Amino acid sequence: MPADLSGTWTLLSSDNFEGYMLALGIDFATRKIAKLLKPQKVIEQNGDSFTIHTNSSLRNYFVKFKVGEEFDEDNRGLDNRKCKSLVIWDNDRLTCIQKGEKKNRGWTHWIEGDKLHLEMFCEGQVCKQTFQRA
């Protein structure tokens, strides 16, 4: 059975965020500021329909999708690229594959204990983040 990721989550830790941002081609100044942020993630889940808000003092990002249905994703607020995205359940992990200008790009969310985990990957760089309920 798929996990329930619903809730408001605050960043606890982040590993290799700069390497991931470099792979995305994000400029130096933005990378330095982004590393200092503690974003809050708000996930609304209704079955296989999701709305995810990632909010910080620098930028906010919003995505809405249904598991198993490819959609056009506009990454304005992140790296300003557009891609085709497909989100699937991989057991209790929610995994997104993003096809576009950058190769091997996507992310995976899952819950372990009382923590939300996120792995973001792009062109060989992997960023691992851990969130706790707000």
From Swiss-Prot:
CDD domains: CRBP4 (cd19465). The lineage of its organism: Eukaryota, Metazoa, Chordata, Craniata, Vertebrata. Keywords: Cytoplasm, Retinol-binding, Transport, Vitamin A. This is Retinoid-binding protein 7. The keyword Cytoplasm applies. One of its GO terms (biological process) is fatty acid transport. One of its GO terms (molecular function) is retinal binding. Belongs to the calycin superfamily. Fatty-acid binding protein (FABP) family. It comes from Homo sapiens (Human). Expressed primarily in kidney, heart and transverse colon. Detected in adult lymph node, appendix, ascending colon, and in fetal heart and spleen.
